[in-house]
Swiss-Prot record:
Its cofactor is Mg(2+). It comes from Rattus norvegicus (Rat). A species-specific loss of a key phosphorylation site in murine DAPK3 seems to direct it mainly to the nucleus which is proposed to be compensated by the interaction with PAWR to maintain at least the cytoplasmic basic membrane blebbing function in the apoptosis pathway. The modification Phosphoserine is found at S304, S306, S307, S313, S321. GO terms for biological process: apoptotic process; apoptotic signaling pathway; cellular response to type II interferon; chromatin organization; intracellular signal transduction; negative regulation of translation; neuron differentiation; positive regulation of apoptotic process. Ubiquitinated. Ubiquitination mediated by the UBE2D3 E3 ligase does not lead to proteasomal degradation, but influences promyelocytic leukemia protein nuclear bodies (PML-NBs) formation in the nucleus. One of its GO terms (molecular function) is small GTPase binding. It catalyses: L-seryl-[protein] + ATP = O-phospho-L-seryl-[protein] + ADP + H(+); L-threonyl-[protein] + ATP = O-phospho-L-threonyl-[protein] + ADP + H(+). The gene is Dapk3. Ubiquitously expressed in all tissue types examined. High levels in brain, heart, lung and spleen, lower expression in kidney, liver, skeletal muscle and testis. Isoform 2 is expressed in the smooth muscle. This is Death-associated protein kinase 3. The keyword RNA-binding does not apply. Keywords: Activator, Apoptosis, ATP-binding, Centromere, Chromatin regulator, Chromosome, Cytoplasm, Cytoskeleton, Kinase, Nucleotide-binding, Nucleus, Phosphoprotein, Serine/threonine-protein kinase, Transcription, Transcription regulation, Transferase, Ubl conjugation. Its EC number is 2.7.11.1. Homooligomer in its kinase-active form (homotrimers and homodimers are reported); monomeric in its kinase-inactive form. Homodimerization is required for activation segment autophosphorylation. Interacts with DAXX, ATF4, NLK, TCF7L2, UBE2D1, UBE2D2, UBE2D3 and CDC5L. Interacts with PAWR; also demonstrated in aorta smooth muscle cells indicative for the cytoskeletal targeting function of PAWR. Interacts with AR; enhanced by AATF. Interacts with LUZP1; the interaction is likely to occur throughout the cell cycle and reduces the LUZP1-mediated suppression of MYL9 phosphorylation.
């Protein structure tokens, strides 16, 4: 957890005029007591309760401060100090007083591609530094591209407002809905995994506007704007791009690619011929077209300031973000239900197979019982035949001569013993047959 100075910022800085404001932040000019150095004090309203939507969460503030403390680059605003009180965290930032780049360019009588690329090169250098540290700005737009001093011979670009910047961790999926609708990438609109590529899309939109004074995806409503972005619905209208080089258009085309993996990276953009090669343009008609381009840029700048509050970063889409999160949760629940349904079907199929196998075993068992019964019946028939034969032999013996009387008695005795034994065996077999018949009937009933 980051620690900030638990002191009254006004004990160290004299507060001055307000420079800008957002949904939960106010920026004021300030002067350090003792040194007279001028800075910008950004007052960020803290969120008091985790469940509240008012204010900025501690986690978000700490993330912004952590990123600002890490970065040091000529084209990125510098953090000097951080204070905290009961209601606010106060960032003491480098004072960037030259105004917005687009406002500066809109004041010029003419604008060449060479001048545009000089400023764009500074933007790319700043973004290249961020991306080298795996930091994505996620809110690159004209009002976050400032000049340190517009009166300097070669004004220096400063990238500001790291309120929604994130470190992109390898192997970790990150999704969110934020940014400014006109400049966000399709993967933000579609709630897909985000990376450094989203900044490159924003640079493509900024370049398009810089060269034409027209916004490539801006619709009559925010929803129309988002639809245009998702469909990559833009073109190079001849009215706006008649004097624009093919190299410049190619630079934009390589950035405004829906698939982030196919989008030009920051390293590739710095190596693009339009950025590397400075071309001087001559001809009588070119200055007039360049003046027309600057006039259109003025119109865009005036329109954007009149239609959108300064330093507004997709705050109005927070509800949309929550809706998309709910939709994602519902889709996840649906996928789990479908998975459960598949598992139930698989279990039913397994039970059906088990029942069929059991039925087959019962049929096989019934067939075995039938074979045993037939075998016992055969044995019974043989036993009956033996009994009949014994009776016939006894009758034959009775018909013998008187001399055989003793033998006949013995035979009769033998017959009686044998008859008793046979009767017992016959009774046993009959009992066994009845038992087997009952088992067979019970088995057939169980199968049905």
């Amino acid at each position: 957890m980051s620690t900030f100075r638990q002191e009254d910022v006004e004990d160290h800085y004299e507060m001055g005029e307000e420079l800008g404001s957002g949904q939960f932040a106010i920026v004021r000019k300030c002067q350090q007591k003792g040194t007279g150095m001028e800075y910008a004090a950004k007052f960020i309203k803290k969120r008091r309760l985790p469940s509240s939507r008012r204010g900025v969460s501690r986690e978000e503030i700490e993330r912004e401060v952590s990123i600002l403390r890490e970065i040091r680059h000529p084209n990125i605003i510098t953090l000097h100090d951080v204070f905290e009180n009961k209601t606010d965290v106060v960032l003491i930032l480098e004072l960037v007083s030259g105004g917005e780049l687009f406002d500066f360019l809109a004041e010029k009588e003419s604008l060449t591609e060479d001048e545009a690329t000089q400023f764009l090169k500074q933007i790319l250098d700043g973004v290249h530094y961020l991306h080298s540290k795996r930091i994505a700005h996620f809110d690159l737009k004209p009002e976050n591209i400032m000049l340190l001093d517009k009166h300097a011979a070669s004004p220096r670009i400063k990238l500001i407002d790291f309120g929604i910047a994130h470190r992109i961790e390898a192997g970790s999926e990150f999704k969110n809905i934020f940014g400014t609708p006109e400049f966000v990438a399709p993967e933000i609109v579609n709630y897909e995994p985000l990376g450094l590529e989203a900044d490159m899309w924003s640079i493509g939109v900024i370049t398009y506007i810089l060269l034409s004074g027209a916004s490539p995806f801006l619709g009559e409503t925010k929803q129309e704007t988002l639809t245009n972005i998702s469909a990559v619905n833009y073109d190079f209208d001849e009215e706006y791009f008649s004097s624009t080089s093919e190299l410049a258009k190619d630079f934009i085309r390589r950035l405004l690619v829906k698939d982030p993996k196919r989008r030009m990276t920051i390293a590739q953009s710095l190596e693009h011929s339009w950025i590397k090669v400075r071309r001087r343009e001559d001809g009588a008609r070119k200055p007039e077209r360049r003046r027309l381009r600057a006039a259109r840029l003025r119109e865009y700048s005036l329109k954007s300031h009149s239609s959108m509050p300064r330093n507004t970063s997709y705050a109005s889409f927070e509800r949309f973000s929550r809706v998309l999160e709910d939709v994602a949760a519902a889709e996840q629940g649906l996928r789990e239900l479908q998975r459960g349904r598949r598992q139930c079907r698989e279990r039913v199929c397994a039970l059906r197979v088990a029942a069929e196998q059991r039925e087959a075993r019962c049929r096989d068992g019934s067939a075995g019982l039938g074979r045993d019964l037939r075998r016992l019946r055969t044995e019974l028939g043989r036993t009956e035949a033996l009994r009949t034969r014994a009776q016939e032999e006894a009758r034959a013996a009775l018909l013998g001569a008187g001399g055989l009387k003793r033998r006949l008695c013995r035979l009769e005795n033998r017959y009686d013993a044998l008859a008793a034994q046979v009767a017992a065996e016959v009774q046993f077999v009959r009992d066994l047959v009845r038992a087997l018949e009952q088992e067979r009937l019970q088995a057939e009933c169980g199968v049905r």
